[in-house]
């Protein structure tokens, strides 16, 4: 039996005849209204390719819902395309959109009394925003990813969008021609779907499987594949099954499920944004998760995946060898995954993986065995020290160097740093420090992809490091340390750094320090005054007042 108590409160009984009249105006019958009314939350717009196909997929999801006796109602959630906003003031709205998406789903689902919902996402912040709404509302719900784009092509080799960002730096350094840059621009994204490498979108899709919120194997199929369509229908059917047994997101999102997510994040070398978003989803689920949990698991889970930006392959390649379950099964077999966590199938993680058919051909060029990893520890490390007492995050899998000691070059905004990099005024050995770009200071904690890609494109990726209280795109590579907390806007040590101060990044020891005495830092702190808020009205001003530290997931309180 389905629980219709939520929709009955809005549409049931003679006194709700006016409410039902609105549904009948759209062609619904008494029989339709008597069934579970379920939402299909689609993060859709025409701003970019990541989500352009999701309305079509939502129709297939609705077919699956109808097959098992539900009445689906589609609604949209806002989308901000990070790749388009990147490197501009618009990027300040990116992380903000995560919270807006979660709020939008809550508003629509609770405002219309839906009995459950499917969440369908594509671009970077749509996915954590939707998963946060699932955890917050805690009614039967299932997540589905819209799929990745296929690899692009440049003179016969596969490329992804990260290659275009780096090409901007290469062009500014005279290493490629304007024609090369144009060809890459024209061919990097060949059609619908999210960015092809193991950037934030694909990272979050994989994590949805590890958490148990989406169907096994559903994260890897490209947007244009027939498997994507099959998963759409099965996702709709799965929602009705979940509703029948009364399974809710918080039954799935246990502490052990988040440990599974962290283990996959470390083994895959996924986006550092995965840290921020897992913390935020856990917050909504009422699960106590900290950076120490990431640090602990990172030390015992090797990185075994060879995907861009640190590696060679894209999500479509992982799909061909079996998808995310290939990685999860290796972790389970080694005892690095909790097999008893429940998932949206109603079965445990171990049961799902035992039933999933993995192609029987060689795949160690993309996914290695744990006995022969690409890195002996996780692809992401948590760094703490005098420059980041609460913590910071670095993606070691995307850097050939793990240690750097050098003089600080301090900038108070991304724009200042980017202009200096393009003018080739950054020297080998420098540590570029970009501050006042944190959750409160930006506000919005922008991703520094334009700057990091320009550094790499100029050939300085192994000779220069970067430290920021902002974030990084999943496409970032090089020794780039982000999420520095406390941030500059609240007087964190990063606010006290001056040009020429020596900064030490030690990825293997998990340290981020500035070579200054405690006495000197305290002296500088006395002279520091908080900057005026950059925004006095509007959404960004509201966000800056409510947002917490990146060490807590930059959630709102």
Curated annotation (Swiss-Prot):
Positions in coiled-coil regions: none
UniProt: [2Fe-2S] cluster binding residues: 50, 123, 195
Catalyzed reactions: (2R)-2,3-dihydroxy-3-methylbutanoate = 3-methyl-2-oxobutanoate + H2O; (2R,3R)-2,3-dihydroxy-3-methylpentanoate = (S)-3-methyl-2-oxopentanoate + H2O
Keyword annotations from UniProtKB, A to Z: 2Fe-2S, Amino-acid biosynthesis, Branched-chain amino acid biosynthesis, Iron, Iron-sulfur, Lyase, Magnesium, Metal-binding
Residues modified as N6-carboxylysine: 125
GO biological process: isoleucine biosynthetic process; L-valine biosynthetic process
Binding sites annotated in the UniProt record for Mg(2+): 82, 124-125, 447
Catalytic residues as annotated in Swiss-Prot or TrEMBL: 473
UniProt signal peptide: none
Essential cofactor(s): [2Fe-2S] cluster; Mg(2+)
PROSITE patterns the UniProt entry points to: ILVD_EDD_2
Enzyme class name: lyase
Pathway: Amino-acid biosynthesis; L-isoleucine biosynthesis; L-isoleucine from 2-oxobutanoate: step 3/4; Amino-acid biosynthesis; L-valine biosynthesis; L-valine from pyruvate: step 3/4
Keyword Disulfide bond among UniProt keywords: no
EC number assigned by the record: 4.2.1.9
Function (record text): Functions in the biosynthesis of branched-chain amino acids. Catalyzes the dehydration of (2R,3R)-2,3-dihydroxy-3-methylpentanoate (2,3-dihydroxy-3-methylvalerate) into 2-oxo-3-methylpentanoate (2-oxo-3-methylvalerate) and of (2R)-2,3-dihydroxy-3-methylbutanoate (2,3-dihydroxyisovalerate) into 2-oxo-3-methylbutanoate (2-oxoisovalerate), the penultimate precursor to L-isoleucine and L-valine, respectively.
Subunit field text: Homodimer.
Protein name: Dihydroxy-acid dehydratase
Taxonomic source organism: Metallosphaera sedula (strain ATCC 51363 / DSM 5348 / JCM 9185 / NBRC 15509 / TH2)
GN (gene name): ilvD
């Amino acid at each position: 039996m389905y629980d219709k108590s939520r929709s009955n409160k809005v549409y049931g009984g003679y006194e709700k005849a006016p409410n039902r009249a609105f549904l009948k105006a759209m062609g619904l019958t008494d029989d339709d209204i008597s069934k579970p009314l379920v939402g299909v939350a689609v993060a859709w717009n025409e701003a970019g390719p990541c989500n352009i196909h999701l309305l079509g997929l939502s129709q297939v999801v609705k077919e699956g819902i109808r097959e098992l006796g539900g009445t689906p109602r589609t609604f949209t959630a806002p989308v901000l395309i990070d790749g388009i906003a990147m490197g501009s003031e618009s990027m300040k709205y990116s992380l903000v959109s995560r919270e807006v998406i979660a709020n939008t789903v809550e508003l629509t689902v609770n405002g219309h009394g839906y009995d459950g919902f499917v969440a369908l996402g594509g671009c970077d912040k749509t996915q954590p925003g939707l998963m946060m709404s699932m955890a917050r509302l805690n009614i039967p719900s299932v997540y589905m990813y819209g799929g990745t784009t296929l690899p692009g092509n440049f003179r016969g080799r596969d490329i992804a969008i990260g290659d275009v960002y780096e090409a901007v730096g290469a062009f500014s350094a005279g290493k490629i021609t304007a024609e090369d840059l144009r060809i890459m621009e024209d061919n990097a994204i060949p059609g619908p779907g999210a960015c092809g490498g193991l950037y934030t979108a694909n990272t979050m899709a994989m994590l949805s499987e590890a958490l148990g919120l989406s169907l096994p194997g559903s994260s890897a199929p490209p947007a244009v594949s027939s498997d994507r369509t099959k998963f759409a229908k099965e996702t709709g059917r799965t929602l009705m099954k979940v509703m029948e047994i009364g399974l809710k997101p918080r039954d799935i999102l246990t502490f052990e499920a988040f440990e599974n997510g962290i283990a996959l994040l470390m083994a895959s070398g996924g986006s550092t944004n995965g840290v921020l978003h897992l913390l935020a989803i856990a917050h909504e689920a009422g699960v106590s998760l900290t950076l120490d949990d990431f640090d602990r698991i990172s030390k015992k889970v090797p990185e075994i995946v060879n995907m861009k930006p640190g590696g060679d392959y894209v999500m479509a390649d992982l799909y061909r060898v079996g998808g995310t379950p290939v990685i999860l099964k290796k972790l389970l077999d080694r005892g690095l995954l909790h097999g008893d966590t429940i998932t949206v199938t109603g079965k445990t993680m171990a049961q799902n993986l035992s039933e999933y058919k993995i192609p029987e051909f060689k795949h160690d060029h993309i996914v290695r065995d744990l006995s022969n990893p690409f890195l002996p520890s996780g692809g992401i490390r948590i760094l703490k020290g005098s420059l980041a007492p609460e913590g910071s995050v670095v993606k070691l899998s995307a850097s050939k160097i793990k240690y750097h000691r050098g003089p600080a070059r301090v900038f108070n905004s991304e724009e200042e740093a980017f202009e200096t990099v393009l003018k080739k005024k950054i020297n080998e050995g420098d540590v570029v420090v970009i501050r006042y770009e944190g959750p409160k200071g930006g506000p919005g904690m922008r991703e520094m992809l334009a700057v990091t890609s320009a550094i790499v494109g100029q050939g300085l990726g192994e000779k220069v490091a970067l430290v920021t209280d902002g974030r990084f795109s999943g496409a970032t590579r090089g020794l780039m340390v982000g999420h520095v907390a406390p941030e500059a806007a609240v007087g964190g040590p990063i606010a006290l750094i001056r040009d020429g101060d020596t900064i030490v990044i030690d990825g293997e020891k998990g340290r981020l320090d500035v070579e200054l005495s405690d006495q000197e830092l305290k002296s500088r702190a006395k002279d520091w005054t908080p900057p005026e808020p950059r925004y006095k009205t509007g959404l960004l001003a509201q966000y800056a007042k409510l947002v917490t530290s990146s060490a807590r997931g930059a959630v709102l309180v």
